[in-house]
Curated annotation (Swiss-Prot):
Transmembrane stretches, start-end: 9-28
Source species: Sus scrofa
Catalytic function, reaction form: L-seryl-[protein] + UDP-N-acetyl-alpha-D-galactosamine = a 3-O-[N-acetyl-alpha-D-galactosaminyl]-L-seryl-[protein] + UDP + H(+); L-threonyl-[protein] + UDP-N-acetyl-alpha-D-galactosamine = a 3-O-[N-acetyl-alpha-D-galactosaminyl]-L-threonyl-[protein] + UDP + H(+)
Keyword set, alphabetical order: Disulfide bond, Glycoprotein, Glycosyltransferase, Golgi apparatus, Lectin, Manganese, Membrane, Metal-binding, Secreted, Signal-anchor, Transferase, Transmembrane, Transmembrane helix
Domain Ricin B-type lectin: 429-551
Swiss-Prot/TrEMBL cofactor(s): Mn(2+)
Name of the featured protein: Polypeptide N-acetylgalactosaminyltransferase 1
Ranges for region Catalytic subdomain B: 285-347
Length: 559
């Protein structure tokens, strides 16, 4: 009996311990879930810790967020606020996990500990709480603490209440100094960044947009390049965060920055010459002619030496090309560091308004950069964009003085040595309209895009969409597109210029006035009755409908 009683005591004690273990396990499991839910909210008292392992939640590991059908209408209304899926963004944790999208060779690189410190400057205007704070947390969570001096948030006159005191209260509790600087009035990206740079303290200034997410290992390779050469300005690979689902998609290390005829920034394939320079090692930085402008790091002192931003430019637009030209022409280097990845929400439209209108502001800014940096090539730009010549672009004497002081190289040097594959044709037979003798109509790109048909329309003599270049390589170019025909009697389409002749090779006879498509041995003809706005090729007949006048456009009157 005594032995039986002893066994019952042992059994009961064991059962109690098992139940206690189960209780503790369930308790802490639920607590973890509570913490995870809290991280998705807005309470200013929460300080989020670095992500140690992937969470199970919307958008984790960069996966897309799917909105239930019953919430689609509300989602569409919320989308209008910031021109991205605000509902999806608010479902995602402020410190969500992201995949490591670096090249394998980047993951094993070792960087010195004594890299310079950086201040991260982020300008915002009426930004969503979730995207702004997710940017901040990604910087904190994925940056070595001793390299991150501070984060400077510059408020460009936001009107939303949660971006006032609630934001200040929230960032005070973060484990890295975060300063909120307020612009007294709407000043635009350029002047707001100058304000942030002026108050920052790091040896390097890193500019980010307000809807970014930094990935693991993003900072060290940027700072390492600047430590190697303080005159090197570096950009990360810009990954895409979907504005619809907030899916994180890795950007390509095989593209770099350029620009088209209208001085719009464009991404183009990295040319073979740059691959050869790097001996095929894709983990080495890419020398890029221009940068997108939203995300880059620059040595603080060098930023001052080369003239920071052009403070005479307004709001936004053109400043990225201006600083790109200036860096290269004045002795610096501009790189995309392929081992650094930062995501950016790319929107299809802007939610912001611009005083004076977007077109007027960009025309002014582009006029300033053309007058200061493009030398004789500004004439080409003015022919393509005649509206630019009619804007008041202000006083540029200080910027011209800066160029003289820094002994900067001419723009022709930039095109020959840094951007030889530029879309600006340096050697051409004609630049202007291509007019049909019979109809008196002109070829017109109709503002159409790649893979669309070229048009024909009444000649207006104002340049713009009716400016074509007949190049020394016998291409007919409109911006970065070439006229291309792939079949007999086919329509003429606009494809990316490949410089391989083939379907893009045209022979102009200045006596017969014909444009012969060499591959097909047919001639460019007027539009047909079936499609009155699309020219095609036909068997060469010598008819007036196959005769074309190539006329150079005269420079518009400049104010």
């Amino acid at each position: 009996m005594r032995k039986f009683a002893y066994c019952k005591v042992v059994l009961a004690t064991s059962l109690i311990w098992v139940l206690l273990d189960m209780f503790l396990l369930l308790y802490f499991s639920e607590c973890n879930k509570c913490d995870e839910k809290k991280e998705r909210g807005l309470p200013a008292g929460d300080v989020l810790e670095p992500v140690q392992k992937p969470h199970e939640g919307p958008g984790e590991m960069g996966k897309p967020v799917v909105i239930p059908k019953e919430d689609q209408d509300k989602m569409k209304e919320m989308f209008k606020i910031n021109q991205f899926n605000l509902m999806a963004s608010e479902m995602i944790a402020l410190n969500r996990s992201l995949p490591d999208v670096r090249l394998e060779g980047c993951k094993t690189k070792v960087y010195p500990d004594n890299l310079p410190t950086t201040s991260v400057v982020i300008v915002f205007h009426n930004e969503a709480w979730s995207t702004l704070l997710r940017t901040v947390h990604s910087v904190i969570n994925r940056s070595p603490r001793h390299m991150l001096e501070e984060i400077v948030l510059v408020d460009d006159a936001s009107e939303r209440d949660f971006l006032k005191r609630p934001l200040e209260s929230y960032v005070k509790k973060l484990k890295v100094p975060v300063h909120v600087i307020r612009m007294e009035q709407r000043s635009g990206l350029i002047r707001a960044r100058l304000k942030g740079a002026a108050v920052s303290k790091g040896q390097v200034i890193t500019f980010l947009d307000a809807h970014c997410e930094c990935t693991v290992g993003w900072l060290e390779p940027l700072l390492a390049r600047i430590k190697h050469d303080r005159k090197t300005v570096v950009c990360p690979i810009i990954d895409v965060i979907s504005d619809d689902t907030f899916e994180y998609m890795a950007g390509s290390d095989m593209t770099y920055g350029g620009f088209n005829w209208k001085l719009n920034f464009r991404w183009y394939p990295v040319p073979q010459r740059e691959m050869d320079r790097r001996k095929g090692d894709r983990t080495l930085p890419v020398r890029t002619p221009t940068m997108a402008g939203g995300l880059f790091s620059i040595d603080r002192d060098y930023f001052q030496e080369i003239g920071t931003y052009d403070a005479g430019m307004d709001i936004w637009g053109g400043e990225n090309l201006e600083i790109s030209f200036r860096i290269w022409q004045c002795g610096g280097t501009l790189e995309i560091v392929t081992c650094s990845h930062v995501g950016h929400v790319f929107r299809k439209a802007t939610p912001y308004t611009f005083p004076g209108g977007t077109g007027q502001i960009i025309n002014k800014n582009n006029r300033r950069l053309a007058e200061v940096w493009m030398d004789e090539f500004k004439t080409f730009f003015y022919i393509i964009s005649p509206g630019v010549t009619k804007v008041d672009y202000g006083d540029i004497s200080s910027r011209l003085g800066l160029r003289h002081k820094l002994q900067c190289r001419p723009f022709s040097w930039y095109l020959e040595n840094i951007y030889p594959d530029s879309q600006i044709p340096r050697h051409y037979s004609s630049l202007g309209e291509i007019r049909n003798v019979e109809t008196n109509q002109c070829l017109d790109n109709m503002a159409r895009k790649e893979n669309e048909k070229v048009g024909i329309f009444n000649c207006h003599g104002m340049g713009g969409n009716q400016v074509f270049s007949y190049t020394a390589n016998k291409e007919i170019r409109t911006d970065d597109l070439c006229l291309d025909v792939s079949k007999l009697n086919g329509p003429v389409t606009m494809l990316k210029c490949h410089h391989l002749k083939g379907n893009q090779l045209w022979e102009y006879d200045p006596v017969k006035l014909t444009l012969q498509h060499v591959n097909s041995n047919q001639c460019l003809d007027k539009a047909t009755e079936e499609d009155s706005q699309v020219p095609s090729i036909r068997d060469c007949s010598g008819s007036r409908s196959q005769q074309w006048l190539l006329r150079n456009v005269t420079l518009p009157e400049i104010f």
